[in-house]
């Protein structure tokens, strides 16, 4: 009897383990090899060579999907598959999806007027153009405003409605992240839920997307035009849902009509260009849809600042996903057309074991450069544990302290309101977390990131030949990083430079410090 009970318990445990494993595997896309899905491994290797040589784009993750299967994927260390990533304007396509779902539930229509949703926030005088703005105009970035509301206060909806609508709605393209915010506000108004909460049972759960978060405005509304964080494979699933016309695992979770409507051409970014001129520029001039962009080769995409892309190629039944920090995001897409696209064939290719093995090795060993492991015992022993009191500065940092222990350097920062501790390793990335907000494209984001910390970070340090200490802090659930550069002299003084990777041209002046 005891043996029987023991075997029963073991069997149940095995069943539970298998069930959990199957459930976990069920949340992932199927994997295959490039050649089995009609793609050349050599084409992907050539792309990786070009990515390594590209000085304008720091690739952070990459995923290539063909016929619904992942055929290549890679993360440049310290980025990793399990990490979420700030998407910037790729978020807009998810806001568009929420609008599509709300339309299918008869909560709104494309022709609903903007002013009908916010009667209490309207300006005293409502112009004819403002009164005619429809949801479809906000989706296609053709509200008619010449300038965008700064939204630096606490009433973003009211601020947006106060900006004059100078052009007839639907006639003039003007990119506006605040128009996307207003779409988010509309969804929340008609559903009683934030966009992220509205999407969770309708989109995220069916696709097996877990752990999503989204920045929120001071009004308690998801920012809509930016601020969503998802993993790389989550983006691939989203792209595949659209590639499959809204169907997932045999179930229509998004209207096929909406997919076609949302991804078809609506307005030219520059109507004065000829077709030949548009093709000769880059993918930025192929036309705008409903919070999606048209792209070359009859493709379309969700994209975000600094090179966050979900490129959907229906004619090739393929998707390419990038997360990156790029100063040439359109050049990033050019690499797809130059290296990856020509390698996509109509039929499966013969297996190429050598190239396949080389590709697996390359993808598994991707890494961003780590600062070299250099030391300076003389200076580090003199400053370790001492406080550097800083002069008044834009970052409101009062003091810093450095401590060295073996191959680790700890940096403590004291601001007007908080204290933070960061750890950096020599010759490798030291992983950690912090509540300190990092670089962000939007100045208004200081108000948006409440509730998102702790942020995932990786730190490394080195001593340079000029005897300066350089600390590199990567925010690995974002694309940006910071550098802290310390220069010490013999008079117990220091100069500190703090450089944000997304604002190199706006570099702040050095901060003077006294070592005590």
Pin down the residues of each PLM region.
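Active-site helix/loop module of the DD-peptidase/beta-lactamase fold
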Residues: 86, 105-143, 162, 193-226, ...
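Structured C-terminal helix/loop/strand segments within mature extracytoplasmic catalytic/sensor domains
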Residues: 304-371
């Amino acid at each position: 009897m005891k043996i029987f009970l023991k075997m029963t318990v073991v069997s149940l445990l095995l069943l539970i383990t298998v069930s959990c494993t199957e459930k976990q595997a069920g949340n992932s896309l199927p994997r295959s090899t490039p050649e089995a899905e009609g793609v050349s491994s050599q084409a992907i290797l050539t792309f990786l060579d070009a990515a390594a040589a590209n000085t304008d784009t720091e690739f952070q993750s990459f995923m290539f999907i063909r016929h619904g299967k992942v055929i290549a994927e890679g993360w440049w260390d310290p980025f990793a598959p399990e990490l979420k990533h700030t998407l910037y304007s790729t978020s807009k396509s998810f806001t568009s999806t929420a609008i599509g779902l709300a339309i299918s539930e008869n909560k709104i229509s494309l022709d609903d007027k903007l002013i009908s949703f916010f009667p209490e926030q309207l300006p005293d005088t409502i112009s004819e153009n403002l009164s005619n703005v429809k949801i479809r105009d906000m989706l296609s970035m053709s509200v008619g405003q010449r300038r965008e509301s700064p939204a630096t206060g606490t009433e973003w909806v009211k601020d947006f409605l106060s900006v004059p609508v100078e052009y007839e709605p639907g006639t003039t393209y003007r990119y506006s992240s605040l128009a996307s915010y207003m779409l988010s506000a509309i969804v929340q108004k008609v559903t009683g839920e934030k966009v992220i909460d509205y999407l969770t049972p309708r989109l995220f759960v069916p696709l097996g997307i877990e752990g999503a978060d989204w920045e929120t405005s001071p009004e308690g509304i998801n920012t809509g035009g930016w601020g969503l964080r998802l993993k790389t494979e989550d983006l691939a699933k989203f792209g595949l849902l659209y590639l499959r016309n809204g169907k997932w695992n045999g179930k229509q979770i998004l209207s096929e009509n909406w997919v076609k409507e949302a991804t078809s051409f609506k307005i030219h970014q520059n109507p004065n260009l000829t077709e030949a001129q548009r093709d000769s520029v880059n993918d930025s001039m192929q036309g705008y849809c409903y919070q999606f962009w048209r792209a070359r080769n009859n493709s379309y995409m969700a994209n975000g600042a600094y090179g966050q892309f979900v490129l959907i190629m229906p004619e090739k039944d393929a998707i390419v996903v990038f997360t990156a920090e790029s100063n040439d995001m359109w050049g990033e897409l050019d690499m797809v057309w130059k290296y990856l696209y020509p390698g996509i064939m109509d039929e499966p290719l013969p297996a190429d074991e050598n190239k396949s093995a080389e590709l697996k090795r390359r993808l598994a060993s991707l890494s961003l450069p780590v600062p070299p492991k250099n030391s300076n015992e003389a200076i580090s022993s003199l400053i370790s544990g001492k406080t550097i009191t800083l002069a008044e500065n834009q970052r409101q940092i009062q003091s810093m302290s450095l401590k060295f222990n073996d191959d680790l350097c700890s940096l403590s920062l004291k601001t007007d309101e908080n204290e933070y501790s960061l750890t950096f390793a020599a010759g490798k990335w030291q992983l950690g977390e912090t509540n300190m907000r990092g670089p962000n494209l939007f100045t208004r984001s200081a108000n948006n990131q409440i509730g998102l910390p702790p942020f995932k970070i990786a730190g490394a340090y080195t001593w340079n030949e000029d005897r300066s200490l350089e600390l590199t802090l990567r925010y690995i659930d974002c694309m940006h990083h910071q550098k802290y550069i310390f220069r010490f002299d013999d008079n117990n003084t220091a100069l500190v430079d703090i450089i944000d990777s997304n604002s190199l041209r706006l570099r702040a002046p050095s901060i003077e410090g006294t070592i005590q």
